[in-house]
């Protein structure tokens, strides 16, 4: 042994004090320090508020992303205790408030006191103290017993003692924090991720209002999640745009004694005419993605209840056809939720519930309710049974089709499917497969690829829309069969094996036209419905071939999007131009001109935010009344004409008072200060937002250093932008690519396939509920929801982006 080697004895054992352990090993407490861990911080704080709601003391939670990137979570619960904590004070030799204990000591909180919380989601008791430890800045405010209190921390350490702010009529807790950039790879909160979880919590906790606001986006309306129907509303939401077999979801609720106290069970279910099963399970509001005893008990009871009803009423269609749980769950949408005093989760991530007593409670309550429901509703029961038998027959047909496909694949395994051009590398981690639209582009991709690790699979035309097809039809589709065989990982719940995937990057490469978009959507629908693990594990990517090639003399560049092209042309046009305001003779050039141009672009962003709410800008301008523009819009009920504009917060409150249901329908057109700031900045130049479309009277003369180009007078702000873009076009050659086949092999490699230069979009699943909703609406059988979606988004489409 090296004499210099340090001795490993008791002196080498380090004890991390307080929250230092959390900062040293954050992954042990929040999973990771990436996007998932960042949002987990918010969930930990929100869960505390929801626990207050579950205990009956809180009715509203407000989550707000601040303009500067911080986030606040407030509730109207009891408020964290602020009295002196005698035990911890004696231990540390100074007076310490209960608030400081909760925020700085691991495994401290009311959740271990069964008199305070019978059930809670924050099982480990490390939540809010972890958030404090991993925050650069953390401020807690408590509103309790008529007084407001505050305490500030940084990276888990107190910066102040408990401060008394003064009297208040509020009650509850407010937490404001800024994640520590020294810990997290990103500190930018994703609105979609947060909204998914908040919507879920509102469904699971009937009667609790959860408000979400995002101050970073001036065009974003606050969202209010409130569902009086609870998980019944959740099932109805999931079945939106689907053809349901009966009107109202079946609902069951009950409580039974468990090993550690009463177990509360709740479930709602409803069948639709589709082919996908959609079941979400929860324990103490925590998603149990791998199920557990509560889901097993429910599924067992469901299968038994259906089979018993068939047997009792002699409804069997064939002695040779045995029904499975898979048949019964085809087209089923269900939510299963339990509240357990002492939940036992398998693994730190709480993905699976393990309490054995929960399974028997779940099975007992489900069985009783379903048996009674089927007997009392024979017509609905018969409709369900008919669907189950059709599903069983389709399963047998799909099994035969699968076996035929597998036999064919085995015979063809030496050369793999059809036109697959495989790569030399055999390690899946290093391999990628391009799914390419058309033989022409496939040929260019074959010539341009790096054959060591890039495989090419050309597909012809539009593949089957699997949203409208049973599994046997999927197996019979030639293009889908080629994809299944090429990937090698199988298909379907029972036959999919991710470890057999031959390429860890599957890249969809289609044309930039409407057909290309349609093919891409069909492929994504297939992967989402039948190989969802590929999306969950982020194996699917979308290639970003350029839309334009711009050349000037010998120089050229590729441009990916219409927005990038507009910016490029505007930048070129602005560089060598100057403007003169004809009324004041004030001239702008260089940075001063860029500032003015950027201000006009802010006006355009404001217009886009209005049009996303289906408010035409010209109509908005016409609504100018008594020196003010409208602040809110109250849309008409579905199918009716004529909405109304509201000009103040008082008018909005009056509308809500007259009709409480209007609260969720009233749109905030913009944050109050946004338009005010725009008008002030435009006023510095003698303009206002009306002048984007309407002339002021005097013009703006644009000139360049090029003597061949005469000065041009613009009379609206829009005209200034359009003219500068036009100047940017002079002297350059623009080629717009409509298809991949228009690029040669070298161009395709340089722009879309070279790992050093290409841009890929990774397909991830942030919100499974919303993804299901969108795929059903856009790709499903029901036409009216799709028409309504298209009509409501029509104003957001730029005419030059339409492929007509």
UniProtKB/Swiss-Prot annotation:
GO terms for biological process: DNA topological change; DNA-templated DNA replication. One of its GO terms (cellular component) is cytoplasm. InterPro entries: DNA_gyrase_B_C, GyrB, HATPase_C_sf, Ribosomal_Su5_D2-typ_SF, Ribsml_uS5_D2-typ_fold_subgr, Topo_IIA, Topo_IIA-like_dom_sf, Topo_IIA_B. It comes from the Bacteria. It is an enzyme of class 5 (isomerase). Binds two Mg(2+) per subunit. The magnesium ions form salt bridges with both the protein and the DNA. Can also accept other divalent metal cations, such as Mn(2+) or Ca(2+). Its EC number is 5.6.2.2. The record marks 462, 465 as: Interaction with DNA. Keywords: ATP-binding, Cytoplasm, DNA-binding, Isomerase, Magnesium, Metal-binding, Nucleotide-binding, Topoisomerase. It is found in: Cytoplasm. Its cofactor is Mg(2+); Mn(2+); Ca(2+). It catalyses: ATP-dependent breakage, passage and rejoining of double-stranded DNA. Its main location: cytoplasm. Residues 431-546 form the Toprim domain. Mg(2+) 2 binds at residues 511, 513. Mg(2+) 1 binds at residues 437, 511. GO terms for molecular function: ATP binding; DNA binding; DNA topoisomerase type II (double strand cut, ATP-hydrolyzing) activity; metal ion binding. A type II topoisomerase that negatively supercoils closed circular double-stranded (ds) DNA in an ATP-dependent manner to modulate DNA topology and maintain chromosomes in an underwound state. Negative supercoiling favors strand separation, and DNA replication, transcription, recombination and repair, all of which involve strand separation. Also able to catalyze the interconversion of other topological isomers of dsDNA rings, including catenanes and knotted rings. Type II topoisomerases break and join 2 DNA strands simultaneously in an ATP-dependent manner. Few gyrases are as efficient as E.coli at forming negative supercoils. Not all organisms have 2 type II topoisomerases; in organisms with a single type II topoisomerase this enzyme also has to decatenate newly replicated chromosomes. Heterotetramer, composed of two GyrA and two GyrB chains. In the heterotetramer, GyrA contains the active site tyrosine that forms a transient covalent intermediate with DNA, while GyrB binds cofactors and catalyzes ATP hydrolysis. Belongs to the type II topoisomerase GyrB family. PANTHER family: DNA GYRASE SUBUNIT B, MITOCHONDRIAL, DNA GYRASE/TOPOISOMERASE SUBUNIT B. This is DNA gyrase subunit B. It comes from Chlamydia trachomatis serovar D (strain ATCC VR-885 / DSM 19411 / UW-3/Cx). The lineage of its organism: Bacteria, Pseudomonadati, Chlamydiota, Chlamydiia, Chlamydiales.
